[in-house]
Amino acid sequence: MTKGNGALFYELANRGNKGILPRFNYAAGSNDPATAQHAGDGFLMRQGYTLLWNGWMNGLPAANNTLRIELPVATNPSGPIVETVWDELLFNETEAKQARLTYKATSTDQAQAKLLVREHNSEEPTVIPAERWEFVDAQTVRLLPAGTPFKIGAIYQFIYKAANPPVTGIGFAATRDIVSFARYATADDAGTPNPLTAGGRPALTRTLSQGNSQSGRYLRDFLYSGFNEDEAHRVVFDGSIPTVASGRTFLNYRFSQVGRINPAGHGFMFFPGSEFPFAYENQTDPFTGKSDGILARCTASNTCPKVIHLNSGTEYWQAGQSLVTTDPLGQRDTTPPSNVRIWSMTSIAHQGVNPAMPKGVCAMPYNLTDYRPLMRGALVALDRWVKDGTPAPASRYPRIADGTLVPSVKLNPAIPGLAMAKGPNEKPRLDFGPDIDKGIISKALPVALKDRYRVLVPNVDADGNETAGLALPDITVPTGTAMGWSVRSEFGGGTGELCYLDGAFIPFAKTKAEREATKDPRPSLAERYRDNADYSERVKAAATALERDGYLLPEDTKRIVERAAKLTW
């Protein structure tokens, strides 16, 4: 601990996987990091952070050193809890011939189950006759005749009875308690010593957390559910970085499905995790009159962390990110609390450098813009904010007031090769039954009510790139149109629907003649930049400005400029 900086950096593992070394160290991914490749450039170690992970999610495979948690099941005084549940099954490869259910069915009698299918979210599902499917076992189903593949891109829903729900909300307590132990204790109740001590006292002076995507939504839900206060009423996390995460999770419910993302553009529209409240500050739901906010409980207990919320363009289209900074009806901008920064990463895709969908499922080339430099900048800024009170760089995000946050109907750039999305995912209020506030879902399937929270998206310029937010040089000195969304191809099924978590990139033509041949209105690379030296100088100026404002680290400015110098066309 003598070489440490006093800060614990805790990662909420995404589906049991360790990701902060690839994200913050540009390292090779591994759940058992042991080599120089797994350490990458050593950024976190050079900064002196103590790294911590633990399991919080159940039901994960034991392979690949995933971090898991074993949980008790909930029961009634009279015996097992049995309820009707549902799974949604969507395949993006052509060879899927069996489907694994989240829970074991209490009976393989087909009369007690139902399989439905639809092509698009907006369609009514069709019941698949019992003679066209069967149980393989209590947790697996397949189509008939045996060997029939599930249709790629079709949305299947399977309704069945299950028993013995695990108490998945314990995951929140597992996170709270391990971090509280590391920060405050010298030993646990059994006498096991805390390894993070110095001179017989806890060595940590502050605690930071980060989660990406699913685990970022878990982090927002952790805060919302009041777990940033430990059992001794102390602060758990001093600072948090929820990343590409605008909703919450399907965790603290009976028969939860923690790995679900709701929504995902095509399918997965009816699971908990995207309901009010959306914003960090308290707001009033116009449909129910309920007042609530992500930070309501920690505000009441004076245990809120400082937050840098990092989102991509994908969250606006897929997950209602606009509602984090507007009122629930999308009519006016709101002001995040003083302890929150919103860094909206301009024209960035959720997946960054690692596409989610197999090749061919999305209709356009992937947007692989690397947003990791902004994550590294966020960590250093957050740590400084927590440690000595230096305010983190200001929020940057699209706003209604200046016309940078708009209805999607205003977006239609005339770009060859652009397959325009119908619009962002709608945000209906869902009816899960009268006991949803107790974590009990009594309607399978839930019902989408007529009430709609209005979702807006970032405006774009003549090139099709977003006009507001925190823009990397890839966007301010562009080589093409980068989008946080894409649409599904004919091959991928659900044609025209949003393509999961991937974005699209449509490069500029190299020359004026080339763009005129395709009637591309966007100036070509040759028309924009005299040569690579001109391009590189502009990239350097853009990166230096971000560094000056505190969003980029000097070593990442250097990396970005060196990469630009290698670009040729």
Indicate residue ranges for each PLM-predicted region.
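C-terminal His-loop and adjacent cap/lid subdomain of alpha/beta-hydrolase
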Residues: 1-569
